[in-house]
Amino acid sequence: MAKAKFERTKPHVNIGTIGHIDHGKTTLTAAITKVLHDAFPDLNEASAFDQIDKAPEERQRGITISIAHVEYQTETRHYAHVDCPGHADYIKNMITGAAQMDGAILVVAATDGPMPQTKEHVLLARQVGVPYIVVALNKADMVDDEEILELVELEVRELLSEYEFPGDDLPVVRVSALKALEGDKEWGQSVLNLMQAVDENIPEPERDVDKPFLMPIEDVFTITGRGTVVTGRIERGVLKVNETVDIIGIKTEKTTTTVTGIEMFRKLLDEGQAGENVGLLLRGIKREDVERGQVIIKPGSVTPHTEFEAQAYILSKDEGGRHTPFFNNYRPQFYFRTTDVTGVVTLPEGTEMVMPGDNTEMKVELIQPVAMEEGLKFAIREGGRTVGAGQVTKINK
């Protein structure tokens, strides 16, 4: 194997701004790009507030979300930053994971303190597995009383602790996004301080290739004289020829086999890794032993399950979703990775029904096992049409 070439590139981290409406998320996003552009002109372009605020609409799994993507660099890192103009866009983005976050900047206005959407975003961040939070206490220039600033900071820390973030330990940085954007030197420095806190407190994510091997099966073929080949895109990890793998999901029994060949673009490889579309030749496996929807994994790294809890967003009628609400015992299909499995929905106590456009927690019982872990995303479908999207928050069985 040729040695991997050494690339002088910075670590890449995905972050986003979350928090209550009008607390200054978009202004802060613009201020970060401006301040970093001023500090490191050759590394950064400044993005104006209007550019970010007029976020283009994206469609992810049939769901329309407005997301602004900006990128910038500190001395040590390269960041991709997402900001959503509307509250509904945040909810949709966080649940569908359209833009996955390695960490978030929670923006809280010092003039208001934590508000209902602050709570909702923190709860969602906890449920969908945003692992780290740094707080920007914004509009700090508008509060003269030190005691009030300290009280608001305490409130934010308590809120974060309530949702199992390390509220006492994580950084809370006082900033004024607007003043920084207007070129005020002192408040410009506050935004640099914030980014230093982000650099130091949001760890680099584990790269997909370093995780245990997993590939969802998309297709199965028989090649005469050679055996059974399954194709798919490697989701994570690295697989070498002659390694042992488990095939799990859909069926009750797992199958263990050896991969005797790995092909990509009709060429034989020594190994396949995350992101590559490959064909795997499996020893002693018949065509009917495996099917689309199963996954091939490093033995023992994932287990199949039928019962889980999830946070889901249900498409509105305008997004092509349902026109009517659904109730307890709703039975749609849950599309995991490459296949649909029917499941029965139990709504949280006190929730009679779920309207199109709502987000909700739910318990689901599938009729066939699916290889799953917390954080796994799925679409909710009715006869092939997407009516919702969600993420596994807890596995029950």
UniProtKB/Swiss-Prot annotation:
Keyword Nucleus: no
PROSITE patterns: G_TR_1 (PS00301), G_TR_2 (PS51722)
CDD domains named in the record: EF_Tu (cd01884), EFTU_II (cd03697), EFTU_III (cd03707)
Annotated spans, G1: 19-26
Binding site for Mg(2+): T26
Subcellular localization(s) per the UniProt record: Cytoplasm
Enzymatic class: hydrolase
This protein's UniProt keywords: Cytoplasm, Elongation factor, GTP-binding, Hydrolase, Magnesium, Metal-binding, Nucleotide-binding, Phosphoprotein, Protein biosynthesis
Residues with the Phosphothreonine modification: T386
Region spans: G3: 83-86
Domain tr-type G, first and last residues per copy: 10-206
Main localization of the protein described in the UniProt heading: cytoplasm
PANTHER family named in the record: ELONGATION FACTOR TU, MITOCHONDRIAL, ELONGATION FACTOR TU-RELATED
Family, as annotated: Belongs to the TRAFAC class translation factor GTPase superfamily. Classic translation factor GTPase family. EF-Tu/EF-1A subfamily.
HAMAP family: EF_Tu_B
Functional note: GTP hydrolase that promotes the GTP-dependent binding of aminoacyl-tRNA to the A-site of ribosomes during protein biosynthesis.
Name recorded for this polypeptide: Elongation factor Tu-1
Phylogenetic classification of the source organism: Bacteria, Bacillati, Actinomycetota, Actinomycetes, Kitasatosporales
